[in-house]
Amino acid sequence: MDKFRVQGPTKLQGEVTISGAKNAALPILFAALLAEEPVEIQNVPKLKDVDTSMKLLSQLGAKVERNGSVHIDARDVNVFCAPYDLVKTMRASIWALGPLVARFGQGQVSLPGGCTIGARPVDLHISGLEQLGATIKLEEGYVKASVDGRLKGAHIVMDKVSVGATVTIMCAATLAEGTTIIENAAREPEIVDTANFLITLGAKISGQGTDRIVIEGVERLGGGVYRVLPDRIETGTFLVAAAISRGKIICRNTQPDTLDAVLAKLRDAGADIEVGEDWISLDMHGKRPKAVNVRTAPHPAFPTDMQAQFTLLNLVAEGTGFITETVFENRFMHVPELSRMGAHAEIESNTVICHGVEKLSGAQVMATDLRASASLVLAGCIAEGTTVVDRIYHIDRGYERIEDKLRALGANIERVKGE
C-alpha cells in the first residue's frame, strides 16, 4: 500500500485549481444510465471511485470513454446487476439501482462498501423505491429491485435527511408515471447539480436545493453535455491548509456560495477572506488561527466532510474549541492519530474538545477514512520532522493529485510506493 512521507513544518501558500466535485460526479455518472442518447460529462475528477463507477457502467453494457470529458452511451445496457467485486470498495454503487429499475424494470446491486464511518444503511433508498412501486428483495447480499411496467409517482416523506437516498428517489422518479414529491429532501449543492444534469437530459424537476423536491415523470430522457460543479470539500481542505500554516492561498475554479458555513468559521478563526465569482482567497497574515466551535449538520449547515480538517485547525489554534458531529457516528478516528503527533484532545460522546498546542511533531500515522486522512496529511505539513501517513488509498478515493497540489503550495511531500 502507498504511503505519504511529509517533511515539515512548511508554510503553504500560492494558488490551487479545484477539481470537479466527487460527490456530484458519482451520482451524475450513475444517472447517465437513465439516458437513451449519449451524454458528455465535463470537469469529472480523476479519482479511484470515479474509475470504479466507469468500470461498473461498462460492465452493465454502457459505452464509456474518457478523453478530458467522460462520454457515456447507455443505449445498449443489457446487464442489470452491479457485482460485489466492484461494489465492495464503494458505497456510491447503490446509485445504479434507481436508474436501472426506472428504465429497465429491474436492477440488483451488491450491498456496498466504502469508508467505515458508522451506520450508513441503505434502508432509505429501499423504502423510497418501494413507495414508487418497486418490489425489493434482499437475497445473498444483493438488493434486488423490480417493477412491472413503470414506477408510479408518490408523495415521499423522508424519515431523516439523506443525500444518498434523495439522489436515488429523484433519479428513479424522473421516469415514473405521474408526480413525485420528496419532503425532507437533502439540500446539498451536489443534489442540485444532479438535478440540473437530469434537467439537461429532459427531466422535469423543481425545488432542488430546498427540502421539497417535485419531479414530474417523463417517458424518456435524451442526451446532453453537462459540467460538474467544483468540489467544495477540496476547496475547504486547501483553505484550512493555508489557515493552519499561517499562509495565504487563492483557490480557483471554485464556487464560493457552496461554502458559506465553512467561510464563516474560517473568518471566526481570524482568516482574511475574499471571494469572487469563481475564486476564494484566504490570508492569515502570519497569525496563528483562533479556536472555533463547530457543529456538523446537513446543508446549509457546517458539512461533516470538513469536520476532520477543522478538528486539526482547533488542535493547533489559540484556545479551546468544541467540535460536535451530528451526521455520522464513529467519525473521530483521526483524533487518536493526531494525538500521536502531540495534539491535546478529549472525546466526549459525539463531541471532541480541542485544546490548541503551539506545534505538532512528525509521527507514523494511519488514515482511516477519506477526510480524516486529508487532515493527517495537512498535519504532517505543519508538524516538525517527518510524518508518514499509511493507507492513503482512502485519500485517492476523494482527492485528485493531492500531493502535486500541496507541493505547488510549498509542501515537502512524496508518495512512497507500497509493495
Swiss-Prot record:
Listed A to Z, the keywords are: Cell cycle, Cell division, Cell shape, Cell wall biogenesis/degradation, Cytoplasm, Peptidoglycan synthesis, Pyruvate, Transferase
Record keywords: Manganese included? no
**The protein's enzyme class:** transferase
Predominant cellular place of this UniProt entry's protein: cytoplasm
Key word Membrane present in the record? no
State its Enzyme Commission number(s).
2.5.1.7
List the InterPro entries. Enolpyruvate_Tfrase_dom, Enolpyruvate_Tfrase_sf, MurA_subfamily, RNA3'P_cycl/enolpyr_Trfase_a/b, UDP_GlcNAc_COvinyl_MurA
Q: Name one GO cellular component term.
A: cytoplasm
Which Gene3D superfamilies did the record assign? Answer: Enolpyruvate transferase domain (3.65.10.10)
Q: Name one GO biological process term.
A: peptidoglycan biosynthetic process
Q: In which pathway does it act?
A: Cell wall biogenesis; peptidoglycan biosynthesis
List the catalysed reactions. phosphoenolpyruvate + UDP-N-acetyl-alpha-D-glucosamine = UDP-N-acetyl-3-O-(1-carboxyvinyl)-alpha-D-glucosamine + phosphate
The entry's localization annotation reads: Cytoplasm
Q: Which residues carry this modification: 2-(S-cysteinyl)pyruvic acid O-phosphothioketal?
A: C115
One Pfam short name: EPSP_synthase
Q: Where is the active site?
A: C115 (proton donor)
Entry binding sites for UDP-N-acetyl-alpha-D-glucosamine: R91, R120, P121, V122, D123, L124, K160, V161, S162, V163, D305, V327
Q: Where does phosphoenolpyruvate bind?
A: K22, N23
CDD domains per the UniProt record, alphabetical:
UdpNAET
Report the GO molecular function annotations: UDP-N-acetylglucosamine 1-carboxyvinyltransferase activity
Function according to Swiss-Prot or TrEMBL:
Cell wall formation. Adds enolpyruvyl to UDP-N-acetylglucosamine.
Which family, according to the similarity comment?
Belongs to the EPSP synthase family. MurA subfamily.
PANTHER family the UniProt entry points to: UDP-N-ACETYLGLUCOSAMINE 1-CARBOXYVINYLTRANSFERASE (PTHR43783:SF1)
- This protein's name: UDP-N-acetylglucosamine 1-carboxyvinyltransferase
Q: Which organism is it from?
A: Escherichia coli O157:H7
Its ancestry begins with: Bacteria, Pseudomonadati, Pseudomonadota, Gammaproteobacteria, Enterobacterales
The gene behind this protein is murA
